[in-house]
Regions:
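Alpha-helical transmembrane segments of multi-pass membrane proteins
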Residues: 19-34
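Membrane-interface helix termini and inter-helical loops of multi-pass transporters
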Residues: 2-3, 32-44, 72-76, 160-162
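Juxtamembrane boundary at the C-terminal end of a transmembrane helix
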Residues: 150-163
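N-terminal membrane topogenic signal
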Residues: 3-16
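Helix-adjacent hinge/juxtasegments
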Residues: 60-97
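Hydrophobic alpha-helical segments of small multi-pass membrane proteins
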Residues: 83-96, 110-123, 141-145
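Membrane-interface helix caps and helix-loop-helix hairpins in membrane proteins
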Residues: 76, 96-107, 128-132
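Membrane-interface loop-to-helix entry segments
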Residues: 46-61, 104-116
């Protein structure tokens, strides 16, 4: 492999590996067991089967946004910031699942979701000046996290307090 090949494909490799790590970690953390099934849910909640395909689409779009942003970044400092933003976002995403599904604390997950939402917004805003397409590719993620936060908030209201 030449240095040129690696320079071109490095962001793709990062996006694919990071996306797979997050998907596997999220699958482990998401326990749709008796506790979850016992929660009262709002009538507007999407069916459970929708979440897997939606997160798959979101991760594909986010991965594409990362790769495009990486290739259009004006300098190494911007690339470093982009990598950090995506890592932080992935960690927020994973921690939310652990809080909600493993620790059975939707109330804590709701507070943590603010960080998740802000991390998506940060990526969207950070990329818009040098890669507007990357920024737009993050928009569905921001919308989906907004819906998830509304669902999370409603679940807390319907079922809280949690201990």
């Amino acid at each position: 492999m030449s240095a040129e090949w690696f320079a071109h494909y490095k962001p793709i490799i990062f996006a694919v590996v990071w996306g797979l790590v997050l998907a596997l970690a999220g699958a482990w953390a998401t326990d749709i067991g008796e506790w979850y099934k016992s929660l009262q849910q709002p009538p507007w909640k999407p069916p459970d089967w929708v979440f897997g395909p939606m997160w798959t689409v979101i991760f594909i779009l986010a991965g594409a946004a990362f790769v495009m942003g990486y290739h259009r970044a004006p300098n190494q400092e911007t690339i470093r910031m982009l990598v950090i933003l995506f890592i932080v976002n992935g960690l927020f995403n994973f921690i939310w699942s652990v809080l909600y599904f493993r620790m059975h604390r939707p109330d804590w997950a709701l507070i943590e979701a603010i960080g998740l939402w802000l991390s998506v917004l940060a990526i969207l805003l950070a990329t818009r000046s040098y890669s507007p397409v990357s920024s737009w590719l993050m928009a569905p993620y921001l919308v989906w996290v907004s819906i998830a936060m509304a669902l999370n908030w409603t679940t807390v209201k319907l079922n809280g307090p949690f201990t």
